[in-house]
Amino acid sequence: QGGPPRPQIPP
């Protein structure tokens, strides 16, 4: 179980 996807952080 990798868990929920992480939010995309802008560069």
From Swiss-Prot:
The keyword Hydrolase does not apply. GO terms for cellular component: extracellular region. GO terms for molecular function: peptidase inhibitor activity; toxin activity. Keywords: Hypotensive agent, Metalloenzyme inhibitor, Metalloprotease inhibitor, Protease inhibitor, Pyrrolidone carboxylic acid, Secreted, Toxin. The modification Pyrrolidone carboxylic acid is found at Q1. Its main location: secreted. It is found in: Secreted. GO terms for biological process: regulation of blood pressure. Expressed by the venom gland. This peptide both inhibits the activity of the angiotensin-converting enzyme (ACE) and enhances the action of bradykinin by inhibiting the peptidases that inactivate it. It acts as an indirect hypotensive agent. Belongs to the bradykinin-potentiating peptide family. This is Bradykinin-potentiating peptide S4,1,2. It comes from Bothrops insularis. The lineage of its organism: Eukaryota, Metazoa, Chordata, Craniata, Vertebrata.
